């Protein structure tokens, strides 16, 4: 059995880790970095870029560069948060055929699961390169507050990337696993996880290798991206005030502003002031315009104060659901890059009444925890038991549109719960089971996960038939629902799939696309390599012809020059095999030149050989003597 890897699929950055013996290890990517930007881009010629290469070209290619895609995963196009996101990103968010939010580039639509799969593929390749063997299984993390549709979409992304997702694990729980793996002391901890796009807080009890989640809460649309956007809004407002030009309509300018905002935010975690300089940000009739202004930490904190405060209410709810007070928390663990901000640390300290623990790397701890869970599933990590919870209540719509809960939030998973319902009308022969997830009292205010019909119920007065509805939540937090007519034992079971969501056929098509793209990427890489070889050979051959061309016949020299011309012509095309053939022809034609170079070097070396011989002849007149430098003090000692 191959290694199971742990992947933190983040909004801003992703990270992959693996167990090496009893210790988890974060794996560096091809660029030598321990985290990879969760960014995917398509170039003019259709090449796909993932990670740092995609991030580097974002400024010049904003409409084809997809970032923060995790905010769209498992969401419908009509979701208010999707509509909000449309105004924040330079790329196009379109309605998918299934009603979900998809993205579009050059007229081609991609599901968020598909874009996420490209990042997961990069993580998979990073691990394979390090391990030297194929990787087919993974544990992938998600925000604790992700609903069923978002979890299912993440699992689909893994499948598209060629990974069997053995477990979907909550990010704060993964962080707690990493934090508590070597800790001997039992206690209650709070994991405060403020990442690039999402916020979670979980309360856990840890002791004797048991990690029990008592409660979780959060906001799946609150993170570092929002902090960056506040700085961008401030910069555009200031520029408009000074220059009278609105930069919000200029996608290239916005992308530059976004990068500058992120950089300024990071700098303000250690400095009290930073300078933002963006020359040639735009131009008008009077000429080019430059943006230059100073941003203080105090000003930045005032811009984002409400975002920081928004994290406190979920903390309050999580403590209440866990039945503990802030003073009963033994340790507060900070996770996610945004927790490096001093103001965030200050607010957390004020709320929990204690200095937060900063001993874990907030960018890597989640991937490390995922690797630990992978080790548990593989049997490499012993004596660790993880008990997680479902973040949101689950139930069905009953008469009058009421939301009837079957499983309450923060119930330990896996879990199974049944309840008997009946018909609302006389002689009703079918019922529609509509499954919702959320905390509101009316079904319509919660998230519709899916629906199905149970048909063939024998005619009977209302309230007589007995329909047993069973909810089954697996360890991934993914829901299965069964409805059974107890009179006929007729049963209907579904794995809940969001009213949108990807069908098995969609996923299969995307898997095939991913495989085809992998083949295309391989061919593109091969083409670059053979072109490089061809160009190097031309350069080396031309240099040799300049030096030794007079040592070969005119016919041989002519053959070499023809072969160079033919290879140059081939290099202008895209035919790798053709370039290989012409490279080979040039190598064959250059053989005579190689012989001439070898002969010339032999001739040049001959006088040197004679000289060596004459030295040997005089050897008898030379007296060999060993000598040694002796320190003055050493000499006195010896005397």
Curated annotation (Swiss-Prot):
Family listed: Belongs to the heat shock protein 70 family.
Q: Which HAMAP family does the record associate with it?
A: DnaK (MF_00332)
The signal peptide stretch is: none
Which key words are in the record? ATP-binding, Chaperone, Nucleotide-binding, Phosphoprotein, Stress response
What is this protein called in UniProt? Chaperone protein DnaK
Instruction: Region Disordered: list its residue ranges.
Output: 598-639
Instruction: Write down a Pfam family by its short name.
Output: HSP70
* Function of the molecule: Acts as a chaperone.
Q: What induces it?
A: By stress conditions e.g. heat shock.
- UniProt KW Phosphoprotein keyword: yes
- Sequence ranges of Acidic residues compositional bias: 623-632
């Amino acid at each position: 059995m191959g290694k199971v890897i742990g992947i933190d699929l983040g909004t801003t950055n992703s990270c992959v880790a693996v167990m090496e013996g009893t210790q988890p290890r974060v794996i560096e990517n091809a660029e030598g970095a321990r985290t990879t930007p969760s960014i995917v881009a398509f170039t003019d010629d259709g090449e796909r870029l993932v990670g740092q290469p995609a991030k580097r070209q974002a400024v010049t290619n904003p409409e084809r560069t997809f970032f923060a895609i995790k905010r769209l995963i498992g969401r419908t196009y009509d979701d208010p948060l999707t509509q909000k996101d449309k105004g924040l990103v330079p790329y196009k968010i379109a309605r998918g055929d299934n009603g979900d939010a998809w993205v579009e580039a050059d007229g081609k639509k991609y599901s968020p699961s598909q874009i996420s799969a490209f990042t997961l593929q990069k993580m998979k390749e990073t691990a394979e390169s390090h391990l030297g063997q194929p990787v087919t299984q993974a544990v992938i993390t998600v925000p604790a507050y992700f609903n069923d549709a978002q979890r299912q979409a993440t699992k689909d992304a893994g499948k598209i990337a060629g990974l069997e997702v053995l477990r979907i694990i909550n990010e704060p729980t993964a962080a707690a696993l990493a934090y508590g793996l070597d800790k001997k002391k039992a206690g209650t901890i709070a994991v405060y996880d403020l990442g690039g796009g999402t916020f979670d807080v979980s309360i856990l009890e840890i002791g004797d290798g048991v990690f029990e989640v008592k409660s979780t809460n959060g906001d799946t649309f609150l993170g570092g991206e929002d902090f960056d956007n506040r700085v961008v809004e401030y910069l555009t407002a200031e520029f408009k005030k000074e220059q009278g030009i609105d930069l919000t309509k200029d996608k290239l300018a916005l992308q530059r502003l976004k990068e500058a905002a992120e950089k300024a935010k990071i700098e303000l975690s250690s400095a009290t002031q930073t300078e933002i300089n963006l020359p040639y940000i735009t131009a008008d009739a009077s000429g080019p315009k430059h943006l230059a202004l100073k941003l203080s930490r105090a000003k930045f904190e005032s811009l984002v104060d409400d975002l920081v405060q928004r994290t406190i209410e979920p903390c309050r709810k999580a403590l209440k659901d866990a039945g503990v007070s802030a003073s009963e928390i033994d340790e507060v663990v900070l996770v996610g890059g945004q927790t490096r901000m001093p103001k965030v640390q200050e607010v957390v300290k004020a709320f929990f009444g204690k200095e937060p623990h900063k001993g874990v790397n907030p960018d890597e701890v989640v991937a490390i925890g995922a690797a630990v869970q992978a080790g548990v599933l593989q049997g490499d990590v012993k004596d660790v038991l993880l008990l997680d919870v479902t973040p949101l209540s689950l139930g069905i719509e009953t008469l009058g549109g009421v939301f009837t809960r079957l499983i309450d939030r923060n119930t330990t998973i896996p879990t199974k719960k049944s309840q008997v319902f009946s018909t609302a009308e006389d002689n009703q022969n079918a019922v529609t089971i509509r499954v919702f997830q959320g905390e509101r009292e009316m079904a319509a205010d919660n998230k519709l996960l899916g629906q199905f019909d149970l048909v063939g119920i024998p005619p009977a007065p209302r309230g007589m038939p007995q329909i047993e509805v069973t909810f089954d939540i697996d360890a991934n937090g993914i829901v299965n629902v069964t409805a059974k007519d107890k009179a006929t034992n007729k049963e209907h079971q579904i794995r809940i799939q969001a009213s949108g969501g990807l069908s098995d056929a969609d996923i299969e098509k995307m898997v095939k696309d991913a495989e085809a793209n992998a083949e295309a990427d391989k061919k593109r890489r091969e083409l670059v390599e053979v072109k490089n070889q061809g160009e190097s050979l031309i350069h080396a051959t031309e240099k040799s012809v300049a030096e030794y061309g007079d040592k070969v016949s005119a016919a041989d020299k002519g053959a070499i020059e023809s072969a160079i011309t033919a290879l140059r012509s081939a290099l202008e095309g895209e035919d790798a095999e053709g370039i290989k053939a012409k490279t080979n022809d040039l190598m064959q034609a250059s053989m005579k030149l190689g012989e001439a170079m070898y002969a010339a070097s032999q001739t040049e070396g001959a006088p040197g050989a004679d000289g060596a011989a004459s030295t040997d002849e005089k050897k008898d007149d030379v007296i060999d003597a060993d000598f040694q430098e002796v320190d003055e003090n050493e000499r006195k000692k010896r005397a």
